[in-house]
Amino acid sequence: KNSSIANTMSATYMALAAFFPANLPRNEGTFRSVSLVMPEGSAVNPRPPAPMTMNTVFIAHQIIHAIWQALGSARPDLACAGWGRAIHPISAGHDGARDHDFIMYHWHGMPGAGAVEGRDGFGQIGHLNALGGLTIPNLEDYEQLYPVRYIRQELRCDGGGPGKWRGGTGIEYTVETDNPAVFYFRSEGLGPPSGYGAHDGHAGA
């Protein structure tokens, strides 16, 4: 993945703001003192026609984590442990009962947030770039809007990293549909867990 200059800057500022004291404004005056080195042709400043699909979600996640890990080594008391990466699918098909096509984003299949000093991480919090600002949909609403039925939805057992403060965990769920549907999966959330430990904590599963 590649990141546009605007996305690289916003991800950097967001990562830095997490270390600011509460009384320090999050505005242009504060960030004006920050100098970003973004080599042209790199992943953080690509040349056209480099693809940048969903750069606000996936490579932004890596940028934020890189900054958090660097600053966390200097100030572990302010460090936030890593957040999980999303792998929620998209379902598309035809709703026979309502006779129209549908596209359903599985926003409820979200990862957990890392812990910080003094607080456990939140479970099923959403994408890191939203810092918990994404509203997780209600399953009953989804069952009314789409031709699906949820069999179960539960917090994943021991998904959060152990430590003095426990990391948040993601979701395991089972859903079935009454109609033929195509499922698309984002693969960025596969592979080694991204929920690294901080301040002597351990990584999530």
Q: What are the roles of these predicted feature ranges?
A:
Residues 1-205:
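Glycine/proline-enriched, intrinsically flexible loops and inter-domain linkers
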